[in-house]
Amino acid sequence: MAKRKRQFTEAKIERMIKEGRGQGSGKDYLPWLTIQDVPSEGRVTRGVGWTTGRRHQLLSDIERDYFYLLDYCDDVSDIREQFPLLPLEETQMIAEKIGVEHPKDPKTGISIVMTTDFLITYRDKTLARTVKPSAELENERTIAKFEIERIYWDSRHVDWGIITESDLPDALIRNIEWVHKEFHNEDVPALGIFTIRNLQQMLSARLHNGEVVSRACLACDEQLGLDAGTSLALFRHFIARKIWSVDMTERIIPTLPAKDFSEKHSDIRLEAKGG
């Protein structure tokens, strides 16, 4: 299979603009960059985003982790990753004004379109966030590019900031990751509301009594004649949907009781969108 060309040319940039890259919102947004466009350890979210209803293009582990936090936040209504700083001429002008070299493609030598990792709709505000390991903040070239980015967003009165690993609570993020793909659990419509409510009541009672999560789930599977693992998947679904609450600041370990378990509400929607 031929390798996909990752270098940028003027023709490629023009084509990306015509494709609508960096345009749209919510489910219809098209990121400027995908994991096929850049040499990275990028990944596509396994399931659709809770907030947007689409799969996201995340170019590093730290981007993925920050995405989980955003997707979990009830006050976030849109997440647009790899957002382009267009028009290109504007960032070129900023670079010239502050006396730094504009980012260029190392192979073709042409100026590339800069991007902000995340453009976020938070309540009634728009936030721009760059996500980078703290070690990169010591690189002068990186700082110069950040300054171009900062000035670009400042001219639009958009709050811009940098997120590093120190801003990312690991236990919370790993918990969100663990439940994330079960947000759209296909067992919910397949089993039907009667079975789901029975399972919810039975499992809730066991968890309230401090029973180990895995043991409680297995008992419910056996009692209701469900495939092994069904109740554990639905436990994750209820947490993802925030129907149930546990202490998300400590790692959820299925071989232990659920810490600070409580039922927030019983809004079970019989829908599935894949995972």
Label the predicted regions:
Residues M1-G275:
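Electrostatic, structured charged patches in enzyme active sites and in nucleic-acid/phosphate-binding
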